Amino acid sequence: MNKLPFQKKLLGTGGSRLGLSTNDTITVENLLYGLMMVSGNDAAVALAEFIGGDIQNFANLMNEKAQILKLTSTHFISPHGLDNDEHFTTAYDLALLTDYALQNETFLKIVKTPNYTININNHSKQLNNTNELLGYLDGVYGVKTGFTNGANRCLVSACKRGNLDIICVVLGCDTKKDRTKDSINLINYVFSNYSIVNIEDLIKIEFENWKKNNKNYFKINKSAEENLNIYINEAQIPFKHIAVYNSEINNISIIINISSYLEAPVLSDYKVGIINVQLPNTSSFTIDIINSITIRRKNIYYYTNMFLKDYFSLLTF
């Protein structure tokens, strides 16, 4: 693990601090714990200069990542987020960013840690996570508190109960008590009123049931084969799971529309229909139903072959 000497020029960083002094030596991992557990702005600047060379270049890297993650209402100026009119984000963008960050095992490990001992110059320092919901509210496993005079009290929480995993973002609270209460109320409301639905499985089950109940559905004019072999384009299903309000689960609509009459030849990969999916309070999406085999058109060879089959069957009889 890289060890960094803490430089004197970083001492002027305002806001909450890890408490580093000039020429302190600390590992990158310990800086990350100091950043995420106790909002160490001095740790943020030290990491930014280590990674980006300077604060401006690191801010540029953050803004590039924001574009990749489609954080359309976010712009970074600094690694610590102290008040600046050009440094801003939204609750929605913070949720997207948190969802991405939680996929990183190191990040996840740190933000779910209630207390941790770091070493500065080989001297131990105890850190206690400032996230008041960690270890207090059932299912909470992170992620970060925040405060500036401009933003007031903020908290991003991650919480999982059963198969429902949510991110809750509360911004602009006047007090820590308000931040805690609002977060708890929002989280409990979601788990009391929403369920996770595997929409991909629902679509597949509906489609397989349709095939089972409509084995002789297709009428293929001038066809040498009797039936199609159809499948759905699973790549068009935009997500596997969706959180749905409990009272609206039965309002999920999956409608299969397939043309019953076709004329040969029907090529493989030919679209024969669509599935319309309508979710509660969201826009619908469609999935193509595709034929997987080529259906040949009857021709002279087909009729000759059928004649010979019938002829020799009569001779055998």
Where are these regions (language model features)?
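Domain-terminus/edge residues, biased toward the C-terminal soluble/receptor-binding domains
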Residues: 72, 86-88, 92-93, 98-317
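Active-site-adjacent loops and short helices of periplasmic peptidoglycan-processing enzymes
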Residues: 1-92, 98-105
